[in-house]
Structure formats: structure tokens, C-alpha cells
Amino acid sequence: MIELKHVTFGYNKKQMVLQDINITIPDGENVGILGESGCGKSTLASLVLGLFKPVKGEIYLSDNAVLPIFQHPLTSFNPDWTIETSLKEALYYYRGLTDNTAQDQLLIQHLSTFELNAQLLTKLPSEVSGGQLQRFNVMRSLLAQPRVLICDEITSNLDVIAEQNVINILKAQTITNLNHFIVISHDLSVLQRLVNRIIVLKDGMIVDDFTIEELFNVDRHPYTKELVQAFSY
């Protein structure tokens, strides 16, 4: 379970980015955090990951194996390491896998799943496309076998086909391996395909919280209706 109780956070004392956030996520529930840029979505993810400490309130995670997938993959990779080195480091650090043959077999399996060419493994992060690097970014997190996965705008660098491929892979992972799956996005269509619950943030506060089946209910918050209408065009 993930639980946030009365969490408030600000980068300085004068302005709070998040205010009195209360969220409970039971095991097995996939949650989307929806809102415009600047509403506090990424800050919320950073708090759950333990990168920041709340000014007020408490955050409880029942599982320590939490990993992120961020929007900009280039900053997530060591620029001086090949893609292969970065992927194998995840296998060693998180799973204790030191056998090179076993590492290679896992990489080959995942390359096929993500529809990526093995020749790209010898490249540096700067030598592959943004879409390819983002798929490697997702692959690296899944190779580590986290119990909780937090994805922050992960489809922003992907074309339509690659986006659907990654979504299908993540959906399969939520069935087999993940306790929790949290997706941070401003794209409602992505959330509709990945999660069963949506929490809406506006100006650092939760204004709506509902299951995906309740998305079009008449009692949705006006801001939620505004977002839904914007994505319907």
C-alpha cells in the first residue's frame, strides 16, 4: 500500500507546490495523476520516490522496491556508458545478476519485446533517437523488477506505434510483477489505456479522484470536465 497523509511541500517557505495531499493506493491498483504542467504532478512523484521530504504530513510505502521512469531519458543515462553497460548495471545492482551469459539472454528477450535492434546496445545515449532511448529507459526499469513503478510523461518522446507497444508492455507487467503502477501524465488518452483510477491535480491540490469507469459522470469536478473536453477535440 502507498499512503500520503496531509502532505504539503514547497521548494521555498513562501510558496507551497502541493497542499494537504491525501492519497491511499491499495496493492494492485494502477493510478494516474492528471493535470496541466506546473500543477505538482512531478513533484508528487518525487515525494513518493523519496527524493524530497514533505514540509508537513507523512508518506508510507509498504514496499521499498520503487523505481521511476522519467520524461527525459537522456538525463537518466550515464552519457559515457553504452546502452548495454547501463542495462547490465541495473541487472547487477537491483537483482545481483553477475553472470554475463544470463545478462545477455535477458537483454535479448527484452530487446525483442521492445522491438529494438541489438546493434543499438553498443551506442552511447546521445547516439540513439529520443524514442529509442525512452524505450531503453523503460526496459532498464523493468529489468530491475521493481514492485512499484512510477512513470512521468514516459510516452512524450514516442511515436504512436512505439507508444502503444510500451503501453502494452507496461499493462502486462502490472498483471505479473507490479504491486503499484503510478502514471504521471497530462495526456488523458494514455491514462485511459493504463490505469483504473485517476487523481486530478490543480494548483497543487487534489480536486477529483475517481475510477476510470466514472470519468464521464455528471458529478465530475468542473476542471476534470474541462480536461476531458480538451482531449475530445
From Swiss-Prot:
This is Nickel import system ATP-binding protein NikE. PANTHER family: TRANSPORT ATP-BINDING PROTEIN. It catalyses: Ni(2+)(out) + ATP + H2O = Ni(2+)(in) + ADP + phosphate + H(+). Belongs to the ABC transporter superfamily. Disulfide bonds: none annotated. Part of the ABC transporter complex NikABCDE (Opp2) involved in nickel import. Probably responsible for energy coupling to the transport system. It is a peripheral membrane protein.
